[in-house]
Amino acid sequence: TGAESGIKWPNDIVLNSKKICGILTELHFTERGCVVIVGTGINVNTESFPEEIKGIASSLKLETGKEVSREALIVSIMKYFEVYYEKYVQTEDLSFLREQYESMLINKGKKVRVLDPKAPYEGIARGINVQGNLMVACEDGTEKCVDSGEVSVRGLYGYV
């Protein structure tokens, strides 16, 4: 479609600078090991949004101008999930995803505002480290490691 798509760190999928998908994960420890629960919300064929989020949220239908088959979409997502999951099972390592994730990181190289409850700050998003934390180069020359559980990141001129 020629639309700009990517990932807004850490877990939003954006299309034309608007959020169309959010992904949440929850980690649980059991006697048998770790369990990760993944939840994904995708705005597929939504045609309107409340006024307060209209500028930052959209749907696949609104951005592409086409009705999207939910069934075909979930089949495609699960196909890719299975491929990546099998690779993880074989290696017990997710580092193979880092380069691909970074190539799709829409705020990489851009000025961001980190809404840290202790003290908000601004800097340039440099990418992610091996733990998936966002690395931000601050104006004072320091580099900060941003943990997704602590803060919210916004673009200087809007959501992205």
Regions found by a protein language model. Give the residues of each.
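Long, positively charged amphipathic alpha-helical accessory segments at protein N-termini or as interdomain linkers
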Residues: T1-S5, L15-V160
